[in-house]
Amino acid sequence: MTAQNIDGTLISQTVRSEVAARVKARVAAGLRAPGLAVVLVGEDPASQVYVGSKRRACEEVGFVSKSFDLPASTSEEELLALIDELNNDNEIDGILVQLPLPAGIDTTHVLERIHPEKDVDGFHPYNVGRLAQRIPKLRSCTPKGIITLLDRYNIELRGKHAVVVGASNIVGRPMTLELLLAGCTTTTCHRFTKDLESHVRQADVVVVAVGKPNFIPGEWIKKGAVVVDVGINRLDSGKLVGDVEYDKARESASFITPVPGGVGPMTVASLIENTMLACEQFHTEQ
């Protein structure tokens, strides 16, 4: 068997079109368009690329996008003061602070300062806690995007054994919670996991987010498994590859996300959905 590719570019465009229609309906009803504040500290080239794509996506769906590009010398106090200002701005529904932050700024302090109802990245402990208690509101963007992909492809998760490789706060941990919520029996693997291969070989669904090119050999993938590759790594040749050995894995898998064009576009689509949700649920009276 050869796996069917899960087309994240196509699904993300569908999600954006759905949000754009909701924005249009809001504006036609005399309500303001949703507003997203995007904060970038420093001049990290990769962060500038990510922020640019997020701002463009906002404008495409009709959001009001406010940009705050701060120098790398910005202090934590100055950044927290800006977040306080944005928390109190009634025309801002979502606040996104691009990570990583420069040395000297405590990321936890910054993320916890964002009001939970404006935390459209889904990183605030309150929102992660809601997901853990099975009452999610604003959900972490990449895991949410993955669940959307699987749902749009009608991939049944209930009763499946899902293995998540990687336990970061941004992907691995919230992904485990999302899969639990979807009815999976979940295993989370990390750097202390013994015999990673045996876990991956048992997986009906495997989600890999470690940031190491071709980290999971394709031969580990069980026949008929669903493979979600969150990694995006550039080889010396310039080629972009994921964390899973794609060509070999697709010989066994039933579905697989390609890199690029799989999970990546869905992260931004989820951010757009979260901002729309925050506007509709929390700030409708404005």
Swiss-Prot record:
Catalytic reaction annotation: (6R)-5,10-methylene-5,6,7,8-tetrahydrofolate + NADP(+) = (6R)-5,10-methenyltetrahydrofolate + NADPH; (6R)-5,10-methenyltetrahydrofolate + H2O = (6R)-10-formyltetrahydrofolate + H(+)
Pathway in which the depicted protein is active: One-carbon metabolism; tetrahydrofolate interconversion
Residues the record lists as binding NADP(+): 166-168, 232
This protein's record includes keyword Oxidoreductase: yes
Transmembrane portions of the chain: none
GO biological-process terms attached to the record: L-histidine biosynthetic process; methionine biosynthetic process; purine nucleotide biosynthetic process; tetrahydrofolate interconversion
GO cellular component, one term: cytosol
Superkingdom in the source lineage: Bacteria
EC nos: 1.5.1.5, 3.5.4.9
A GO molecular-function annotation: methylenetetrahydrofolate dehydrogenase (NADP+) activity
UniProt keyword annotations, A-Z: Amino-acid biosynthesis, Histidine biosynthesis, Hydrolase, Methionine biosynthesis, Multifunctional enzyme, NADP, One-carbon metabolism, Oxidoreductase, Purine biosynthesis
Record text on subunit structure and interactions: Homodimer.
Function: Catalyzes the oxidation of 5,10-methylenetetrahydrofolate to 5,10-methenyltetrahydrofolate and then the hydrolysis of 5,10-methenyltetrahydrofolate to 10-formyltetrahydrofolate.
Family of this protein: Belongs to the tetrahydrofolate dehydrogenase/cyclohydrolase family.
NCBIfam families: PRK10792.1, PRK14186.1
Protein name from the UniProt record: Bifunctional protein FolD
Organism per entry: Vibrio parahaemolyticus serotype O3:K6 (strain RIMD 2210633)
